[in-house]
Regions:
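Structured segments of extracytoplasmic/periplasmic soluble domains
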Residues: 1-4, 124, 128-131, 144-147, ...
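General structural feature for long, well-ordered alpha-helical segments within catalytic domains
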Residues: 121-124, 137-140, 308, 312, ...
Length: 421
């Protein structure tokens, strides 16, 4: 997954990695280390500024999903010349856009573009499937191996939802953050985790409230989903391994997958909470930052439980709200219509709707009201943690949007004399 993702970020990454590996100087070792952290020569925590001499000044918004320098207008003009099925392939999660021998644009499925990596990956998954005695995990590994070869991920995505095993595996093309042009194309990643059965059972109760929250979202009722997908699985796990898009730059604390709207409609989504990662983020990042930005009186209200619960609610809220929509008589999705603005808007939606949902549950005595003060205080402190990701990253941009709006509305105050909020 690392090898594929590296090539998805930028077509020059593989060659640059080899060049850095050949540099045995101390600064060369440091550059290679940071290159691998960022999956490229741009610092994701520093507005994508380049740190390797000779690398492009600007990280390409196209990644390597599209021809270098391609604009959104060029893509839109091209797909207007295609048939419906060809247009669907061009916008697919699982294809790249390339120039053929005659310099004409074409879509190439992932199983062809990344064949040299996916064929051996499929072999490894089949070998792993043969070793496990857990039938649900075995089924997923076998079907995901087949998907790597066929480029049809639907069946294995559905099966992934039903994994019930001590070891939970997520592997394949999922998130679309790296496609800065349209957020159409999925990046490859992998997570191997150990399930925390007790914590998973404790949080499963939140699933029973999702339809009620959906029915009470502050939006025009016509945009509400009258019947959410049947699956609303919540898994609390400890991460033991991550790669590809799951192990670059800022480490994710949780994920809500799959993103394929067909699967979401039928089965819902699975929310995976990486508890050991969240504990590290809270203790090693949020607490130290809070001592700088929050008043001493408010620091007592910070709580890991509030931090963990808001992240859980955030992931649950990704599955709520409009997904499949009709625009000018066309059946489409929110993701396809919002294009490059989708990811930050979706992350902001999940953050704020998470607060709305938890407030709703507290107001209706479904969640302990004592969470209220710690929830909002911890949310504010966490905003300073997340905005460090930068405006070029979806979560960082989403937090900046929220922070500025809430500041304008007087949701919190800044004391210029103390420098605290």
């Amino acid at each position: 997954m690392d090898a594929i993702f590296l090539r998805q970020v930028w077509s020059g990454n593989a060659a640059m990695e080899k060049k850095l590996e050949a540099d045995k100087t101390p600064i060369g070792r440091e550059r290679l280390h940071y290159f691998r952290i960022n999956a490229g020569p741009w610092s994701r925590l520093d507005e994508d500024k380049p740190f390797v001499p000779g690398s492009p000044e600007v990280k390409p918004v196209t990644g390597s999903f599209y021809p270098p320098g391609m604009t959104s207008d060029e893509f839109e003009n091209w797909i207007q010349t295609l048939s419906d099925s060809e247009r669907e392939n061009a916008k697919s999660y699982f294809s790249v856009i390339r120039l053929d021998a005659d310099k004409k644009l074409k879509s190439v499925p992932y199983n062809e573009e990344y064949k040299q990596f996916l064929d051996p990956a499929a072999k490894c998954l089949r070998e792993a499937a043969a070793l496990t005695t857990n039938e649900s995990l075995k089924s997923f590994l076998e079907k995901r191996a087949a998907a790597f070869l066929s480029n049809d991920y639907y069946d294995s995505d559905v099966t992934w939802m039903d994994i019930d095993a001590p070891i939970d595996v997520t592997i394949g093309p999922y998130e679309t953050y790296e496609d800065g042009l349209f957020n159409y194309k999925a990046s490859f990643e992998a997570f191997v985790t150990l399930k925390d059965e007790a914590e998973s059972a404790k949080l499963a109760r939140f699933s029973q409230y999702l339809q009620e929250i959906e029915d009470n979202l502050p939006e025009d009722p016509k945009y509400r989903t009258p019947k959410l997908g049947s699956g609303a699985a919540i898994r609390v796990v400890d991460e033991v391994f991550a790669s590809g898009d799951g192990n670059r730059g800022v480490q994710t604390a949780a994920y809500n997958l799959p993103n394929d709207e067909r699967v979401v409609k039928e089965k819902g989504t699975k929310r995976v909470m990486l508890k050991n990662v969240q504990e590290a983020k809270f203790n090693k990042t949020l607490i130290p930052i809070s001592k700088v930005v929050l008043s001493p009186a408010d620091q007592k209200d910070l709580s890991f439980d509030a931090f963990f619960t808001h992240i859980l609610s955030h992931e649950l809220m990704h599955g709520l709200g409009p997904q499949n929509i009709v625009v000018d008589g066309r059946n489409t999705t929110v993701r396809l219509e919002l294009k490059e603005t989708y990811s930050p808007i979706e992350e902001a939606k999940a953050d704020i709707t998470a607060l709305f949902a938890l407030q709703y549950l507290m107001d209706h005595n479904m969640v302990d009201k004592r969470l209220e003060r710690t929830l909002y205080t911890t949310y504010l402190a966490s905003a300073f943690r997340s905005v460090r990701f930068g405006l070029s990253e979806a979560h960082g941009k989403a937090v900046a949007l929220q922070f500025n709006y809430l500041s304008d509305k007087g949701a919190f105050n800044y004391d210029a004399a103390t420098g605290h909020y």
